[in-house]
Swiss-Prot record:
GO terms for molecular function: glycogenin glucosyltransferase activity; glycosyltransferase activity; manganese ion binding; protein homodimerization activity. Glycans are attached at residue 195. This is Glycogenin-1. Keywords: Acetylation, Cytoplasm, Disease variant, Glycogen biosynthesis, Glycogen storage disease, Glycoprotein, Manganese, Metal-binding, Nucleus, Phosphoprotein, Transferase. It comes from Homo sapiens (Human). UDP binds at residues 9, 11-12, 15, 77, 102-104, 212, 215, 218.
Amino acid sequence: MTDQAFVTLTTNDAYAKGALVLGSSLKQHRTTRRLVVLATPQVSDSMRKVLETVFDEVIMVDVLDSGDSAHLTLMKRPELGVTLTKLHCWSLTQYSKCVFMDADTLVLANIDDLFDREELSAAPDPGWPDCFNSGVFVYQPSVETYNQLLHLASEQGSFDGGDQGILNTFFSSWATTDIRKHLPFIYNLSSISIYSYLPAFKVFGASAKVVHFLGRVKPWNYTYDPKTKSVKSEAHDPNMTHPEFLILWWNIFTTNVLPLLQQFGLVKDTCSYVNVLSDLVYTLAFSCGFCRKEDVSGAISHLSLGEIPAMAQPFVSSEERKERWEQGQADYMGADSFDNIKRKLDTYLQ
C-alpha cells in the first residue's frame, strides 16, 4: 500500500546501520508498506546512498533550516534537537497512516497488522507502564498535530528530556481511555524487561514480533565473530540476557547490510583485513612468544562497528553515597538505578 509507511530516524552513521538492519528485517518479513527514513545532516552522503537502496524514501530533516515553528522551538529549547527531528514524522502527510520505529528495533515477524490500529497506539513502557514507550507507535500524519506538538514542546518542554515525555503529555489519555490503543508488549519487547521479568519472557518471549535494544549499548557497539556467530562487549552489559536477538541482528547486518557498506566504501572488505597487516604488526604480535598467527588473524577478523558511548563513572565512596541518599540526591539513572539495586538484592537472596 503506497499511502502507508514504516518510518524511522537516523541522526548519524552509527544509527544509520541500525536503520538499515531494521529496514532489511521489515523486507525480510515481506511488509507491503513503504519504508521511510528521516535523516539529519550528520548522516554522511555515502551513508545516505546506502539508505536509498533499502528505503523507498530518504527524507533529509534539518530543524535549523526548516523555516517553520520547529526552528523557533529549537532556538527556545536547544536540548530538544533530536526530539524535534523525530516529531517531524507527523509532517509526512503524503501518507494516511504510519508506524514509527526507532532505529534500535528489530522486526522478528510480519507486523503489517499494526496498520489496523488507530493513533496513538503503542506498548507500555517497562519503566512506568502508565506511559507508553515511543520506540514503536502507530500514528496519523497531520500538519495540525505536528504544530500542536511543536507548541507543547516550546511551552512545556519534555518531562524526560526526549520525545517520549512530550508524546505522553500530548496523548495523555492513552493510559485510561481506549485499551485497543495499548499494543501487546510483543510489538515492543525491550531488552531490559527480559532481565527484569525473566519468567514472563520464558512464557511469552517466543511470540515477540519486535525487539527493542534499549540502553546505552546498542547492537552495533558489540564485537561479532562471524565464524562462531557470537557477540561480545568490551563493557559489561547486564541486559545481554538473551544474546540470540543480538546474534540475529548481526546475522541480518552481515548478510544484507555489510555488502552494501562495502559497495559504497563505508567498510573495508573484512576478508582482506589479515592481508593488509603490516610486517611490523606481525612482528609486534609475535614478539611476546605466546601469540600464534591464527589467533591474531582471528582477532582482527571480528567485526566491530562502533565505540560504546563514553560514560563518566567517577568513584564515589560508600560514605559519600550514603550522604547523597540522605540528602535526596540518589543517582537514580546510574549506580542507584532500580536495575542495579535489584541485582544487588538478588545476590543477597540467592
